Each structure stands twice: as C-alpha cells, then as structure tokens.
C-alpha cells in the first residue's frame, strides 16, 4: 500500500516494513520476520523492480520482527544493513535489543498472545544475526535512497530510531509502544 509518494507499506501480521522509491533505487526500512522474505520479493516485483535495485536496508531497532530477513537482503541483493550504533551489537550477535522494561504489562493484553503466535509462525522468536552492519547516530542524514535523517528515539530499545524524510514530510517510526 502506498502511504505517501514513493513510500510503500508492506504489512505482514502486526509488523510493517517499508519500501522507499528514489529514482532507480529502493530503500527497505525494517526487514520484517525471517519468513516475510516473499512479501519483499513480491512487492519489489509489483513495483517493476528487481532485488538488485535494493540499495540499502535501514533497521529501526534490533528486535526479530524488524531484523528478520536483513541478512538475507544483504547477501542476496548486496544491500548494506544500517542500524543505530546502540543496537548494532544486538543485531550482529542475534541477542536482541534491550527491551523497554514493560514486558510484564504486555502479558495482560490479549493482543500480546496473538502477536506472539503470529511472530512464531513467521520465524521471529529469534534474531537472525546480521554479519555486517553499518551504524548511524542521532541527526545523521544518510546517503541512501530517500536521504532520511535519523531521529534517535530510545525506549523500546536503546537504539530505537525514527527516520525523517524531509523532502516528503514523512517520519517513519517502528514499534510505537
């Protein structure tokens, strides 16, 4: 679904990830769960593009429902993977980003269980390590399609980040809770 000019939301279960078109290149923001790969491939094809057009992958944080197929995109499409420096080690080791400390409260919400079962079916209960990552910090304007500016938003994880696309007046966030 196109949510703004050249910005496409790819949804699988409760997780959203985005493809940003910029000229002949694509930027992937977040990488869903490991089994969401086919969603990416189908979406790229529907845009009349090839995986080789994927220029970079930006991760908003190091949780398995956002890093899922990032390593596969890196090795298959040759797209470098970027993440905030505070979550880089978690992404590389597969240990997961530090939680926001509210996990117990989630247990009281019925949607928590639907989310966990959805993530389990899609292979997202464990982070797939990303062997090579580049890092960004608050305020960085990245030289990737869309030229997003990083807005560090710690809380959900220490390295949670939003991405501001100034020329499109769009702020992409990840898990809002």
Model-derived regions, located:
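A generic local structural motif
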Residues: 14-15, 42-46, 67-69, 136-138, ...
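Conserved beta-strand hairpin/beta-sheet module of binuclear metal-dependent hydrolase folds
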Residues: 1-47, 162-176
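Metallo-beta-lactamase
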Residues: 33-35, 88-177
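Active-site-flanking alpha-helical
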Residues: 68-69, 91, 162-163
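Conserved beta-strand scaffold positions in the cores of enzyme catalytic domains, especially
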Residues: 7-9, 81, 133-135
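Active-site metal-binding motif and surrounding structural segment of the metallo-beta-lactamase
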Residues: 37-88
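Active-site neighborhood of phospho(di)ester-bond hydrolases with catalytic His/Asp-centered motifs
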Residues: 29-32, 55-62, 81-84, 152-155, ...
């Amino acid at each position: 679904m196109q949510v703004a000019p050249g910005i496409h939301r790819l949804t699988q279960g409760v997780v959203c990830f985005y493809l940003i078109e910029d000229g002949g290149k694509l930027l992937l923001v977040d990488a869903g769960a490991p089994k969401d790969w086919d969603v990416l491939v189908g979406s790229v094809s529907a845009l009349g593009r090839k995986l080789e057009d994927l220029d970079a992958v930006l991760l908003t944080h190091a949780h398995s429902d956002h890093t899922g197929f990032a390593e596969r995109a890196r090795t298959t499409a040759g797209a470098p993977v970027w993440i905030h420096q505070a979550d880089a080690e978690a992404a590389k080791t597969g240990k997961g980003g530090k939680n926001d400390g509210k996990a117990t409260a989630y247990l009281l919400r019925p949607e928590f269980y639907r989310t966990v079962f959805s993530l389990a079916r899609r292979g997202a209960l464990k982070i797939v390590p990303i062997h090579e990552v580049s890092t960004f910090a608050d305020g960085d304007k990245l030289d990737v399609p869309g030229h997003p500016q990083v807005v560090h938003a710690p809380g959900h994880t220490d390295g949670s980040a939003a991405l501001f696309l100034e020329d499109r007046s769009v702020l992409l966030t990840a898990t809002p809770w």
